[in-house]
Amino acid sequence: MSNEFINFEKISRESWKTLHQKAKALLTQEELKSITSLNDNISINDVIDIYLPLINLIQVYKIAQENLSFSKSLFLKKDIQLRPFIIGISGSVAVGKSTTSRLLQLLLSRTHPNSQVELVTTDGFLYPNQFLIEQGLLNRKGFPESYNMELLLDFLDSIKNGQTAFAPVYSHDIYDIIPNQKQSFNNPDFLIVEGINVFQNQQNNRLYMSDYFDFSIYIDADSSHIETWYIERFLSILKLAKCDPHNYYAQYAQLPRSEAIAFARNVWKTVNLENLEKFIEPTRNRAELILHKSADHKIDEIYLKK
């Protein structure tokens, strides 16, 4: 961490866990296992030490958002309109964004039982493979230019204004957008937006996705550790794909282990590492909170914007 983080308060794990009174984890070990991504590693103690204080912090921001909205309505002499509380979660491929997002969705649902808590991933806003092929962009999939940012910004604008919104659905099994399938959102109380690009906007330098966020999180780790996690995840995906000939990764499932590792390492270095270093990591200081992971996936440091 460098002067890039001069505007952040660094908090150790030991200090962070004292910011919430000891309580039950609000979920069972089985539930935690069901929402944990392939090759990610999270324990009930992590939930208690890291995520319960985080839920408290989100509540602080939510109260502040509601108070500001109320005050603005009075100032403008308009009816009070409660808007969805939008949380953006970013970080590299294979760093654990999906686990964090699903866990926050579950914990927010438990702590706000009368609230609607929804989750959307920006994968659904990738252009379909056919379009990427036609534009010569298939090998740039995941880079900023491969996303339909106009559609994504329109989606967020509809959500923020309390309108029903629809998001395309992406399947990792077929490595493409599912045709004619949409996920609908009807004015949720909380919306979690997860993706590698949630702090980026390639097409409109005057408007960022983060302009719509009420709270934002960046999952951080040393790139060498993320590379290891990426390769481990790739091998796990290949094991699952062996049983499904329709799975996109089935074409790689018969590779000898050494060749599969070499293939994954090459993809990491030529695609994911470049994307991380050029487009993802430079946006992390736009987050309100940075959760830093050590080699064993455990969050060891927290950075909160001052």
From Swiss-Prot:
CDD domains in the cross-refs? PanK
The species this protein was found in: Streptococcus pyogenes serotype M12 (strain MGAS2096)
Swiss-Prot/TrEMBL catalytic activity? (R)-pantothenate + ATP = (R)-4'-phosphopantothenate + ADP + H(+)
Q: Name one GO molecular function term.
A: pantothenate kinase activity
InterPro entries for this protein: P-loop_NTPase, PanK, PRK/URK
The family line of this record is: Belongs to the prokaryotic pantothenate kinase family.
Q: Where does ATP bind?
A: 91-98
Q: Which PANTHER family match?
A: URIDINE KINASE (PTHR10285)
* Major subcellular location class: cytoplasm
Q: What class of enzyme is it?
A: transferase
Any one GO CC term of this protein is: cytoplasm
In the record, biological process GO terms are: coenzyme A biosynthetic process
Spell out the subcellular localization from the entry.
Cytoplasm
Q: What's the domain of life for this entry?
A: Bacteria
- Record's keyword terms, sorted: ATP-binding, Coenzyme A biosynthesis, Cytoplasm, Kinase, Nucleotide-binding, Transferase
Q: In which pathway does it act?
A: Cofactor biosynthesis; coenzyme A biosynthesis; CoA from (R)-pantothenate: step 1/5
Q: What is its EC number?
A: 2.7.1.33
Asked whether the keyword Nuclease is assigned, the reply is no
What is the designated name of this protein?
Pantothenate kinase
